[in-house]
From Swiss-Prot:
Function statement: May be required for vesicular transport between the endoplasmic reticulum and the Golgi apparatus. Involved in vesicle fusion with nsfA and probably SNARE proteins.
Protein name according to UniProt: Alpha-soluble NSF attachment protein
Gene Ontology molecular function: any one: syntaxin binding
Positions of disulphide bridges: none
Name of the encoding gene: snpA
Pfam families according to UniProt: SNAP
Swiss-Prot/TrEMBL TPR repeat ranges: 14-51, 77-110, 117-150, 157-190
Originating organism: Dictyostelium discoideum (Social amoeba)
Keywords: Cytoplasmic vesicle, ER-Golgi transport, Membrane, Protein transport, Repeat, TPR repeat, Transport
Chain segments annotated as transmembrane: none
C-alpha cells in the first residue's frame, strides 16, 4: 500500500473517531477521542509530507491542531499549527499565515514572546515574498516589538531595518529616516555593531534627498559626522558630500560622476540604485523648471 493510501486510511480513522462523539461523551472519553484523532491526522500528515503533497499535509496537520485544541493540549495544537504552516509555505501562503497566527496566539498567551517573535518574523517574510509590503511592515513591527521585549536587540533591529527598507520603497521617507537614525544611535557604543553606522547614515541621507530635502540632508550629514568621527573618512560620507553639492547646484553630471566613482569601489545594491535614480530625477525636474 502506498503512502497516499495509508494517509487516507488514517484520515478516515480520525474522521470516524470524531463522528463517534456522542457515544464517547456518555462514557467520559471525549478528550481521549480528540487526542487519538489528532494522532491519526498527524500520521496522515507525515505520510503526505513524504509524498510531497504539501497542501494535503498542511490540511491534516491543521486538523490535528484543531483536535488538540478541543482535547487536552494547546501546546501540541500550537506545534501542529507550525507544522501545518511549514507545509503550506510550499505554495499556499494565506493558509500558512493563518496557521502561524494561530500558533502565535497560543505562545503569546503563555508569555513565550521569543518564539512568538520568530514566527511573526516568518509571517513578515511571507508577506515580503508576496510583495505585500504594507502587511510585511506591520508584521515586522510586531516581531520587532516582541524581540525588543526579550532584549534581543540585534533581531529587533533587523526587523526595523526591513521596515525602513520597504518604507523608502513606498516613499515614506520620514519613517525610514527615523529608523535608520534610531538604529545607528543604538549601534554607536557597541564595537560589534558600530561598523554598520556608515550604512545607516548613508541610507538616511539618501532618503532626505529622495524627499527633495537638500537642507535636511546637509544638516543630517553634519549631525552624523558629529555622532561618529570616523564616519568623516568613509566613502559613504564622501559620496554624500558630493551628491548633496550636486543637488545644490542642480548638476546632473556631477551627481552621476560621484555615484559612478562610489559604485566602482562599492557596488550599489538595488535599493540604493532605485533611491539614487529618484534623486537624479528630482535634479532633472529642478533643471527643467529653471529652463
Amino acid at each position: 500500500m502506498g503512502d497516499d493510501a495509508k494517509a487516507k486510511e488514517f484520515l478516515d480513522a480520525a474522521d470516524k473517531r470524531l463522528r463517534g462523539g456522542n457515544f464517547f461523551k456518555m462514557f467520559g472519553g471525549g478528550s481521549s477521542r480528540y487526542d487519538d484523532a489528532a494522532s491519526d491526522y498527524t500520521k496522515a500528515a507525515n505520510l503526505f509530507k513524504m509524498s510531497k503533497k504539501w497542501d494535503q499535509a498542511g490540511a491534516a496537520f491543521q486538523k490535528a491542531a484543531e483536535c488538540f485544541l478541543k482535547g487536552s493540549s494547546k501546546h501540541d495544537a500550537a506545534s501542529s499549527y507550525v507544522l501545518a504552516a511549514g507545509c503550506y509555505k510550499k505554495g499556499n501562503v494565506i493558509d500558512a499565515i493563518t496557521c502561524l497566527k494561530a500558533a502565535i496566539e497560543y505562545y503569546t498567551d503563555e508569555g513565550r514572546f521569543a518564539i512568538s517573535a520568530k514566527h511573526q518574523k516568518e509571517i513578515a517574510e511571507l508577506y515580503e515574498a508576496e510583495g505585500d509590503f504594507d502587511q510585511a511592515i506591520a508584521s515586522y513591527q510586531i516581531a520587532s516589538d516582541y524581540f525588543d521585549g526579550e532584549n534581543s536587540t540585534v533581531s529587533s533591529h533587523q526587523c526595523l531595518l526591513k521596515i525602513a527598507l520597504f518604507s523608502a520603497q513606498l516613499e515614506r521617507y520620514e519613517k525610514s529616516i527615523e529608523i535608520y537614525e534610531q538604529v545607528a544611535a543604538a549601534s554607536l557604543d557597541n564595537n560589534l555593531t558600530q561598523w554598520g553606522c556608515k550604512e545607516y547614515f548613508l541610507r538616511a541621507c539618501l532618503c532626505y534627498l529622495a524627499a527633495d530635502d537638500v537642507v535636511g540632508a546637509e544638516r543630517a550629514l553634519q549631525r552624523y559626522k558629529d555622532m561618529q568621527a570616523s564616519f568623516n573618512s568613509t566613502r559613504e560620507c564622501r559620496l554624500l558630500d558630493g551628491i548633496i553639492q550636486a543637488c545644490r547646484n542642480n548638476n546632473v553630471e556631477d551627481f552621476t560622476n560621484e555615484v559612478a566613482e562610489f559604485n566602482s569601489i562599492s557596488p550599489l545594491d538595488s535599493w540604493k540604485t532605485s533611491i539614487l535614480l529618484r534623486i537624479k530625477n528630482t535634479i532633472n525636474r529642478e533643471t527643467e523648471s529653471v529652463v
